[in-house]
Amino acid sequence: KNDLFSMSHVNPQRVKDAVTNLQAYAKGQDCGDFFVRKAKKAETDHAGQIVKKERPARVAKQYKFTETIEIQVGLKNYDPKKDPRFNQPLVLPLMPKTNTRILVLADAADCNRCQQDNVEFHPFDTLAQTFDKNKPGPIKRWAKKYDVILCSKSQIKNIVKVLGPTLTKINRQPLPLEPTDNLKAKLDDMRRTIRIQFKKVLGLNWPVGMVSDKAEDVTRNCMLAINTLVDNLKKGWQNIKVINVHSTMGPSKRIF
């Protein structure tokens, strides 16, 4: 743990403080002046003295979902056309978000496994009957309902033949499911996996936890994601312009 934190230019205590305050904000608690707020005009009394206005107490809003905590990274001195792109999966210790939807494109054996473990699947043999590879629209709408798509190892080479290149173009390239894989463990890994990815834009973001998680666990996810990104950048920390942490419905806090 100390080795992980010591090789980062980001102060882990600052990250933890930001996460803790986001959690407090989600509960409706006052976070003081921790977050950057819009400037307010100062009022004066008749004697010309500045009067401090009391800020009204916050009331936590109730949402039908659990807020996710994300990190946002802005890059600098990085040319998407010249500098290397990367796409590295990273399995985090803590599941970074809820409701990760996973689909298995299954051969006959994996259809049985998925049924036994109550895992959503689509028989691979029926894909050609369901979709036309020359009509990408329906394939896109179907695939985008899922965060992760797995495919039985026996059929992984036939994906493009049956569905064309559409899944790759929308970043839903199926990942192989080995016959020897423990299905439940595989899905657990997928739910804890984020992709440290750079393609064209200089702004990157990843989920690293939920406001209901322990601040220490979210902090560790943050540090792992940041350090993995830095390892992939051409000039490391010299390519990092800014790093913010924020929650789904909350404000942002700069941590670098």
Regions found by a protein language model. Name each.
Residues 121-233:
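Long, charge-patterned amphipathic alpha-helical coiled-coil/hairpin "stalk" segments used as oligomerization
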Residues 1-158, 236-242, 248-256:
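Polybasic, low-complexity intrinsically disordered tails and interdomain linkers
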Residues 164, 168-171, 247-251, 255:
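Charge-rich, low-complexity amphipathic helices
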